[in-house]
Amino acid sequence: MPKPVVAIVGRPNVGKSTLFNRIVGNRVAIVEGEPGVTRDRLYQDAEWSGRSFTLVDTGGLDFKESDEIIQGVRRQAEIAIREADAVLLVVDAKAGLNPGDEEVASIIRRAEKPALLVANKVEKFDSLEQIYDFYRLGLGDPLPVSAAEGLNTGDLLDRLVEMLPPEKEDEYPPEAIKIAVIGRPNVGKSSLVNLILGEERVIVSNVPGTTRDAIDTPFEANGRHYVIIDTAGMRRKSRIDRPTEKYGVIRALRAIDRSDVVLVVLDAVEGVTDQDKRIAGYAHEAGKASVIVVNKWDLVEKDGHTMNRYTEKIREELAFMHYSPLLFTSAATGKRVGKIMELVDMVAGRHSMRISTPGLNALIREAVLRTPPPSDKGRRLKITYAVQGGIKPPKFVLFVNAPDLMHFSYLRYLENQIRAAFGFEGTPIRFVLRKKTKEA
């Protein structure tokens, strides 16, 4: 089920990023030391009162070009508001009403999206004259908060979850494998989808972002049900210019949330970009199975070592996705495109694979004997038992004497041992540590 998307919009320096960090800061688990994932905190999942949503911070997208402030705010807000399910308009109560605030508010009113007006930087809640001018924005009662101090943010979240659309399930058969095709504009996503489907169901043009929107295409192959979620409409050339291209991420987030398998499509000529890392990182953190598809391979000049060099470079840039199979393709020539669905089936199977508890514990014992767990000041970590606690992605619960002694590098070692013994290619693996209690 896709999470609703909430966009935080407003002119620069009103506290958007502070509010973003306040909402997600204590509700997002980030593994210390995990390499490679780009964490610019542009977007993050959050939860309140049992409702999950994806929060998007426009603070990192303020224009650094020579554009006027209001022009920059307009472009950011139009994209964020169009793609979001709900909007938080943040204004600066200290600075008072500003033409930039009025500009964003007018866009929200025209879009008819659920919106909450957040008057930030309110220090004294017994004297609120400073927020009265914001009623002129036509978005209802301004909610006074202090994002820096956390004041009234609980009330803000209560009102926000009331605005979110009702939860609903996808209408496809439960056994259908949902495949998200993600990547930057013009990397060849639609052409690859057309070849997979064997027919022209998706509009294709050489102009980035010509697909009208994210398109679901159910189909059957070899007796199995699939749904391809094509996000080729990440950017509309007539509406969005290059500085705001990052907002294609919002559609990718939705597609990833709904998917079982993610095809991360890269441009072989341009290589891995920051946006590629962001979107791939979200797929990894969401626990999805994945295949890295390097398209336009026909445009690369090659010698006998080219593929090895490219593989090494991509593995370095997307180190957090080290488990994903890598496929070099050309939608223009059809080379290796036929292998995509083979890999989809394979990684989907690994994503939902279970291994026996005796087999898992035997492997853990051997791994511990080969390389003992870390210790600290005479205390040594002991792993007494292990069990697989879930699938999609595979999750392993380790019962230990002292969870605080576990180091990320040792978990990576155990992950490598599990992968070597059982496979799990194409899927992330999660670990949960449980303290072993002494029996009475």
From Swiss-Prot:
Keyword Calcium: no
CDD domains cross-referenced by the UniProt entry: EngA1, EngA2
Top-rank taxon, per record: Bacteria
SMART domains: AAA
Gene3D superfamilies cross-referenced by the UniProt entry: 3.30.300.20, P-loop containing nucleotide triphosphate hydrolases
GO MF terms, alphabetically ordered: ATP hydrolysis activity; GTP binding; ribosome binding
Key words of the record: GTP-binding, Nucleotide-binding, Repeat, Ribosome biogenesis
All residue ranges annotated as the KH-like domain in the record: 353-437
SUPFAM superfamilies given in the database record: P-loop containing nucleoside triphosphate hydrolases (SSF52540)
Binding of GTP 2, residues: 183-190, 230-234, 295-298
Residues annotated for GTP 1 binding in this entry: 10-17, 57-61, 120-123
Record-annotated EngA-type G domain positions: 4-168, 177-352
GO biological process: ribosome biogenesis
Quaternary structure note: Associates with the 50S ribosomal subunit.
Xref: NCBIfam families: GTPase_EngA, small_GTP
Family that this chain belongs to: Belongs to the TRAFAC class TrmE-Era-EngA-EngB-Septin-like GTPase superfamily. EngA (Der) GTPase family.
Its job: GTPase that plays an essential role in the late steps of ribosome biogenesis.
Protein name as it appears in the record: GTPase Der
Organism this protein belongs to: Pelotomaculum thermopropionicum (strain DSM 13744 / JCM 10971 / SI)
